[in-house]
Curated annotation (Swiss-Prot):
The lineage of its organism: Bacteria, Pseudomonadati, Pseudomonadota, Gammaproteobacteria, Alteromonadales. It comes from Shewanella sp. (strain MR-7). Pfam families: DUF480 (PF04337). Belongs to the UPF0502 family. This is UPF0502 protein Shewmr7_1629.
Amino acid sequence: MELTLHEARVIGCLLEKEVTTPEQYPLSLNALTLACNQKTSRDPVLDLSEAKVQDALDSLNKKRLISEQSGFGSRVVKYKHRFCNTEFSELQLSNAAVAIVCLLLLRGPQTPGELRTRSNRLHDFKDVLEVEACIKQLMERDKPVLAQLPREPGKRECRYTELFSQGAEQINAASLSADSPSADSNSLNAQDRQQLEARVTQLEEQVAKLKDKLDSLIASLS
């Protein structure tokens, strides 16, 4: 499964609204567009037209990841996901797992602490350990749906990303580059780099002075 940014946003919104506002689910095109363009709980914030959202819906329909529904006496078409936990989906997830995947689709890579804080309307995690346990399960599936990203400089927690809109090869490449010495040096900020360069210069000067003293000592003994 490979989702574009717009497709991932649509699926994330459908997953979210199914849980948080079940009385309004399935969603009309207008309601779904508003959900996609929310200023809060979205990263990045988008400004999609209804036409763009419809394009994403058409594409998802071809992938059999959404379905259309029309109510009796209503001409308004509404949309529901077939992403997981349906008779048509191979992906079966717990409520906790749905919450984590939904948040990652809507807000990009996040730490377990961030996921716990932001998931209160989707699922009640007791603590961060429960989030981490769920993440571990999702990563250890026969076909993993999450991956751990390299820890950012100065950060204590690693972030995790979903693999529906991020290729596993990209994640593996990022992990490999983070383990290499060049990645460590590239991660240094400008201030750290300047301090290191100043320290190297200072050490070089000290070595030069010691060499001069050693040469003088050798000359006096000969």
